[in-house]
Amino acid sequence: PYIKVESSLQAVKDIAEFYLQQLQIPVVGITGSVGKTSTKEVIASVLKEKYRTLKTQGNFNNELGLPLTVFRLRDEDEIAVLEMGISDFGEMTRLAKIARPNTCVITNIGTCHLENLGDRDGVLKAKTEIFKYLQKDGHIVLNGDDDKLCMVKEYEGIKPVCLLYTSDAADDS
């Protein structure tokens, strides 16, 4: 016996989306031009102090890697920290549809993948596709030091939290 599908990749993505929805656990979705993996590691490290946390292994962050990560989730897991990498328009929408994050983190808007995305404005547009599937009571965390991310003021009533990383922080005592 077998199940015939038009696209095995689409079937894997659809099953991962369904599986994650059944588990009903919070998801932190992380994207950005650089720093995704380091940010994922830091967030997962903090969360695992209190919650049973599953994180993306390595950088299994594409349209096959994300579903494979989701399939590692078990009933006892309490939160998922999922890295999402893209190189073209529409990819983030497809990844976010699977993950449906409660919290979106965007590390920065750089110059990676300009061959498909055109310029940094294109990168911003592609990365912020993650918001389309953000949970209604969700959170957006942005790098406040990134000039492009500072332009994101809100998404459907959700105002982003912008984190600043400056060397002046120690001088504010």
Task: Describe each region flagged by the PLM.
Residues 1, 52, 159-161:
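Conserved beta-strand segments of alpha/beta enzyme cores
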Residues 1-2, 141:
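Short hydrophobic/aromatic-rich beta-strand motifs
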Residues 3-9:
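N-terminal pre-Walker A segment at the start of P-loop NTPase domains
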Residues 5, 56, 143, 163-164:
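Conserved beta-strand termini and adjacent loop/short-helix elements that scaffold enzyme active sites
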Residues 10-144, 148-156:
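Phosphate-binding loop of NTP-binding sites
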Residues 41, 162-163:
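Proteins enriched for Cys/Gly/acidic motifs involved in redox and nucleic-acid/cofactor modification
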Residues 165-172:
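Conserved small/polar residues in nucleotide/adenosyl-binding loops
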